[in-house]
Every structure is written in C-alpha cells, then in structure tokens.
Amino acid sequence: MMPDTCLHEAFSDSCMGYAEATKLLERACGCFERETSAHYFFENGMRHPGRHAYEWHDPEQDNVAYITYGGLMTQIAALGSELYRQGCRGKTMALIGKTSYPWVLFFLTALCSDMVVVPLDSSLSDEELTKRLRHCRADMVVTESKESLADVEIQGIRRLSFTETRRLLKAGNDLLAAHESDWMGTPVREKQICLMMFTSGTGGRMKVAMLRQENLTMERYVWRDLLNSKDKSLLLYPLSHIAGIGHLRGTLFTGSTTYLSAGFRELLRELAYVKPTIVFVVPAQATLLLEILKGDSVEEGRRRLGGNLRGIVNKGAPLPESMRERFSHYGIDITSEYGLTECCGGVTCSCVRNGRLWSKTGSVGMVIEGINVRIELPDEQGVGEVLIRGQNVFDGYFEDETETKAILKDGVIHTGDIGYLDEDRFLYIVGRKKNVMVLSSGENVIPEELEAELYQIPNVKECLVYEKDGAVAAKVFTGVLGAGEEERLNIALRSLNRSIPGYKRIQKLELISEPLPKTSSGKIVRN
C-alpha cells in the first residue's frame, strides 16, 4: 500500500511531545562540542521541528510512517537515556538489520552519545557476522528480532532487538520526565571515536576504519548546497556502507526529507509515491534506473521516476558519458562523486548551478573545500596516486597497525587510486594502482581506461578488462546473446582498437550471459 499522505508519526505515543521536550533538548545541546554530529543534528532539529526527517513504509500498519525533526531529537534523547541507564555509555554497539526506522534511531542515538556504533551487513552468514562482532570487540548487538543469531554464542555480548524500541523509548521518556537521565548533560567530544566501518575495498582483507566525531561533520556544507528543506530523497544505499551512512546524516544537516527504501522490489512503487527530487546511487543502481526509462517518451519516463527528479548523484566508479547523455535526454542531471570509507565517504562533491547539478565531463566532482588533495609523482600528463589530507581523514584501522601504516602516513591517506586534478580542482580517477596490468611487452595498461571506452558502445551494461596470456582481454555483458550481438560488438571493438595505441588494444572479447560478480557495495569484483 502506498497512500497519498503519511498516516502516523512513529512511536509518538512513547515519548513526550516536542514542545514539552524543547527545554530539555536545549540543555542537551549545551553538552555537545561544536564539531560533532549531535551538535548539528539537534541545532537543525530545533530549527525545523515539524518537518519530516524520514519517511518509510510501516509493514505492521501497512501505511507510510514518518518522524519529524523534533520527534526524532526527542526519541534520540529518550533512547539514549534508557541505554545509559542500562550501562551502555562508552560501549561499542553493533547493528545488524535491513534498512528500517528503528535501525536509524539506534544508529543516530549512538552517534549522539558517548558510544561507538558498528553497522554490519545483514546479508552475511551468522558465521561471518560472529567473526566481525568478535573482531570489533562489540559489547552489545542489536538485531531485527530476538531470534536473530539465536544459535550463536558470543561470550560477553549483550543482545537487544529492534522490536524492543517502543519499550525502550517509554522507559527513557520516564527518565527524562523525572529529570533522572544520565544521558542529559553527558558531553560528546569532537575527538572521540564514534563510528567503526568494516571495509575490504574490492577484495582485500577485512579491516575496520575508526572515525571520529569531527570526521563526520566535514561534509555539512556540501550537503547544504546539494539539498534544501524542500527536497525529498530516496535512500537506496545499504546502511552497512559509508555512502548509506553519509546519506542518512546528510538529511539532518539540511532540513530535507529522506524516504527509507524497502529495496529494489519496491522501487517503482516508491518512486511513484515518494516523487523524489534527488536520488543517490551506485553505478549498478543508475543502470537499473535507465532500464526503467527504456523506450519511454520524455514525459512518460519522468513520470515513472516520480515526475520531480532533478538529479542523480553516483557514489561509485565514474559513469560513462553515454549514460549521462541518456539521463539528460529526460531532463535529469547525473554527476559522480568520489570518496572512501577512510575519509568518511566524501572527498569530492557535485556543483549546483542555478538549481541544477553540474560537473565536468569525465570527472568525479570538485574537491570539497577544506580537504587537501594532491597527486604524488605525476607523469607528464599529471597522472599519479591520489593523496588526501584533511579533517575527514580517519584515525586508522582498529587494532591493525600494519594496514594503518600502509595507507596513512603522517596524516595523509595514500588512496591507491590513480588520477589527476585540473585547474579548477576537479578530480579525475583513471584507475587503481593495484589493478595496473603489466603485459608481456613490459607496457603498463590501466584497465579502467579501456572499460570507460567499452561503456561508450551502445547497450554495454557491464564490462571487465583483464590480462590474459600477456595481452589485453575483456568480458562484456549486454543482456543479449547470439552471433549477431557478438558480431556487433566485434565491429565496435575493431573501431575502438584503431583509435588507441597498439599495446592497449583488446585482443579477446567475451560476451557473457550473466552480470559480473559484485561486492556488497555494488563494485565489480576483479580477480
């Protein structure tokens, strides 16, 4: 069911009203140091108390629920109060579950408290989740139900479930009303570790990035340029990924509204109901949106995406120019941004000109003001490894000095990405240092450069360039099979090969029947 209006505010019967809580929340704000998420979230909450912060489909009542900014801040205070009463102050809390409002509430409460929160991928096996809980030394874990991980014994870890949210809020509200909350008045410091994110890049070993409060506030000006209080966005990223966490926080810097998507199976219905003005995607999701538009007139295509969509922001590998042109045909701007978990997700940003998203062709956006990006050992074209310094740079990997030293040197992140900057501080990513192929001829080839060329061929949805027997080869997925499709691709390949140096030419092209394997964040896996 997707009704025309939101029908109820979540857990509104479990907490005091915002007007009643205002004085308490003003007192709480005085305990948050300035460069903390809590300071900016509560400041914005008091500025827009009646505006919807999040909306979502409530499966229990089969309607659309919402939470206002004022209601959200009140519930954070209530949940934080009860968690502190239970001894959770200073503890590490892991979250396992699909995108839901209770997940969001627990996450934001931890972020606005003296706690460390660890989002985990709910699609992982119990064995893998157990390994990660031990690896990050979690003190407690919150899961979708009491039955989750029921067969797993992890000594010393407390368990809570999102189904207990209402009970916890009522208990916390009683503490606030009686002025017995230890959460009220407890400081949140800029330098404290508040978030730990598991990351393995595109195939490396498991690592846990430690992020401070001040790391997470660096992007606030970017979000305020990108979104305004009239915008409504659709959250598609998984919340175990730094891009999802960024979108979740970005809402609270801006006064805008974010709809928590139930997943791709509901995407068409959600687009029709939510009518988003902006959507944040990874490349695979951008491809899916194009599939939705396929064959439609401009008017019909825009209607299928809700009718109000003005822009799409891609937080992943750079998109081919052909994709940008196809979205532009429907009056939709699409830009790419660059970031990594170790920099809280954001290094570059999209520009907004006259209300429209804009970026230079081929770039992954303009470097965010206050972040220093330089190119190490650039070649004659200015191409080299991308290095990053700034307030957004992480503290290191949890209990992993070796991996920390490999990437973080004197406060500078050595990203392993190869790219260049132009005179306007726009960044262009060419490829990954570790992906560079050394051919039998001794020549170096960056596979991502050739993949960008392959994506210019019509109907190429996915591709992977790799080295085989000392030469360049490629796998291509178009969704079409047969001799005719192979011949079409080979004709296009011959044209491409004539335009590039001999050592870069693709000697073998394989048309594959299934999409390429991907990581949990949507990146194509390289062997």
Name each region found by the language model.
Residues 73-81, 208-230, 236:
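Conserved structural elements of the adenylate-forming
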Residues 141, 390, 395-396, 418-502:
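AMP-binding/adenylate-forming catalytic core of the ANL superfamily
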Residues 217-232, 239-300:
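Conserved AMP-binding/adenylation subdomain of ANL enzymes
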